[in-house]
Amino acid sequence: MIHTLETTVAGRKMKVDFGKTGMLSNAAIFMSYGDTVVMINANASKEPREGIDFFPLSVEYEERLYSVGKIPGGFIKREGKPSDKSILHARSIDRPLRPLFPKGYRNDVQIVNTVLSVEQDNLPEILAINGSSLALCLSSIPFTTPVAAVSVGLVDGEFIINPTVAQRENTILDLTVCATKERVMMVEAGGQEIDEETMYSAIMFGFEECKNIVAFQEEAVAKFGKTKNEPVLYKADEEVEKEVKSFAFDMIKEAMYIMDKDERNAQLDKVKEKISEEFSEKYEDKVADIAEVIYKTQKEIVRNMLLNEDRRPDGRAFDEVRPISCEVGILPRTHGTGLFTRGLTQVMTVATLGALGDVQILDGIAEEESKRYMHHYNFPSYSVGEVRPLRGPGRREIGHGALAERALEPLIPSQSEFPYTIRLVSEVLSSNGSTSQASVCGSTLALLDAGVPIKRPAAGIAMGLITSEDLEKEKVITDIQGIEDFFGDMDFKVAGTEKGITSIQFDTKIKGLSNSCVKDALEGAKKARLHILGKIKECIPEPRKELSKYAPRTEIICIDPEKIRDVIGAGGKVINKIIADTNVKIEIKEDGKIFVTSNNEPEGVKKAISIIEGLTKEVVQGEIYLGKVTKTTNFGAFVEILPGKEGLVHISKLDFARVEKVEDVVSVGDEILVKVTDIDNQGRINLSRKDAIAKKEEEKDK
C-alpha cells in the first residue's frame, strides 16, 4: 500500500511517499522538497557481524547527473566513483545518526541515498539527512530517535531557513543544523567571519525548525512504522569483566595517570601483557571480551579524571592550549610552506600557485563548475607510529581537507586581486588530536609565506566534552588531544580569524549537546583561537611582498570583448601560436580580461601581451605604421602593420617615381613605413609608402 504524508518547511512542501518503491528493502521512501527528490533505502543484516569492535554503519550518497539533465563528461559517459562532495554529504548523514543506535549493536546497516531530481533552490543533501532518519524510524531496524536537518542562511541581518539559490548568493553564512527534538546533534558551517553570538543564535534558529520536522517524522512513524526488531547487543562476559577489572584496575589507573604519552602507552602495553599472562589460558576464547574490558576501564578512568577530579591526562588546565611553534619557508623550491606544531600534533602545509587554467573542473549536480582554491589533506600511517598500506585518500582525509578548505575560503583574495589558482596540501607528520584544525593553522602560514594577500590570518581549535551518564554534569575542554577525543563525547572544531568564525564542524558520541554546551564551546574556542593567532603573527605578521622566484608570474590586460575572437582565431589557431611562440599560459574571460602566465619566462609574458595588444588594436586611417612586407605580387606588396592585420601597397603607391617591378623597391621581410589611406566597408586596408615618406619629410621640414 502506498502512503503519502506532507508538511511545510520554509514555505515549501516537503512530501514523503513509501510503499511505492523498493518493495524488498526494509524501508524505502521517496522524499521530495519542491522539485528535489531523493530516494532512500535502509537495510540491516539479520545477524551481528562477528569479530569486530565497532558499529558497521555504511551511508552512501549517490548523485545521478540525470537529476539535473546532464550527461556525464569523459569517455565512459556514466557516473564513476563518488565525488568528494558526495563523500562529504554521506559523512554529514552518518554523523548525527550513528550515536542514536543502541550501544553494542553490531549488525551491518546500510543507508543508500540516491539523488533523482534536483531543483537548485532545494538542497538534496539536507533532504537526504531527513529522509535517512525517517527511513530508519519507519524500518524494523532498532533506531527510534528521529533527527531533522535544515540549512540556515544570513542575509541582511535576517536568518533564513533553507535559503534559495538567489539567497545563497547573498548569504554570509552557510549553516547546517541537525537535531532531535531535545538536543543539537551535529552542526556544519562556513561563514564570512561570523561573531560567536550570531553563530549561536543561528544554530538555535535552525534547532527550532528542526523540532517541527521531527514532529512530522514522529507522525509518520506512529501511523506507518514497522515493529522494531529486538537488537542483539554485544556485551563482554560478566565473569570476564569482573575478574579482569578486579585484577587490572589499579594498574591501568596508574598507567593512565602518566602525563607523557609515550611513557603512558609503554606502561599500558606492560599491563596488557600481565593481563594476557593471567587470563590467556582461562579465557582463551574470550580475547575480544578481555580487550573490551580493558577499553572500558581506560574510558572509565579518563572520564572520571576529567569529570570528577578536574584533571586532564597531560596536566593542563581545561582552557589551556598545548605549546605551539610555527615555522615558514622550510622547503627551498616550493612556493610557500608552513610548519605548525601543537603539542604532539604537527602539520606541514605546502602552497602551490598556478595559472587560472589550472582550476579544478567539477562535473556534478551543483551549478559550480570550477574551483580556483583547493586544499588536500594527507594522513599517513607514520603520523601515529603505525604501519599500513598507503592507498590514497579515504573518506576521513577528504572530509578533513574540505573542512580546512572551508575555513580559509572567505579569506582568499578574488581573482582580480590575485590572478592565480591556489592549491594547499597538508601533510600530517604527527597526530595527537585535532589535525584538521592544525591544517588550518599550517595553511595560513603557507599562504602568508607564498605571498597570497589573504584578508586576515585564520586558526582552528578543537573543543571536547565530558558528560555524566545522565547528561546532568558536563565539562567543556579546550584543545583536546587524542586520548580526550577517543574517550570523550564531542569533537567541536571551530576555525576563524580575530574578527569571527569561518567554519564549524561538530558532532557527538552522545544523544546531542545542551544549548549551554554549544555556547561554552564557541566562547572557549574564541579564546583559544586568539591565542593561536598571536603565535602565528609572531612568526609571520603579514603576507610576503614578493612571490617565490619559483612561482609563476601572471599579468592581466583588458580588451574589448568584441575582439576576443581576433585573439583566439579560427579554431584557436591564433592563440595556440602565441602560446607556442612565447611559452605562456593564456586564460580569456568573457568580460575581456586576459590572464597571461609564465613559470620562468617574464620576457615571454611581455611578448605575448605585445602580440595580443597588436591583435586587438584598431587600425586608424591616416596613421603611419612601421610594417613588414609579407608578400609581393605584380600589382603591389602586402604589408603586416599590426599582428594579424595586413594591407596592400599598390605598385603606384610604392614610390614617387614610376615603378616597373615591385621587387625593385621592396622585398619580402623588409620593414617599411606606410600610411593607411583607406579602409573599405569589407575591412580591407589600403596603404601608401609614398604618402608615408612625404609626411615624414614634411614633419622634418617643420
From Swiss-Prot:
The protein's enzyme class: transferase
EC number in record: 2.7.7.8
GO molecular function terms noted in the UniProt entry: 3'-5'-RNA exonuclease activity; magnesium ion binding; polyribonucleotide nucleotidyltransferase activity; RNA binding
GO BP term (any one): mRNA catabolic process
A Gene Ontology term for the protein's cellular component: cytosol
Pfam families: KH_1, PNPase, RNase_PH, RNase_PH_C, S1
Catalyzed chemical reaction(s): RNA(n+1) + phosphate = RNA(n) + a ribonucleoside 5'-diphosphate
Record's protein name: Polyribonucleotide nucleotidyltransferase
Native source organism of the sequence: Clostridium botulinum (strain Hall / ATCC 3502 / NCTC 13319 / Type A)
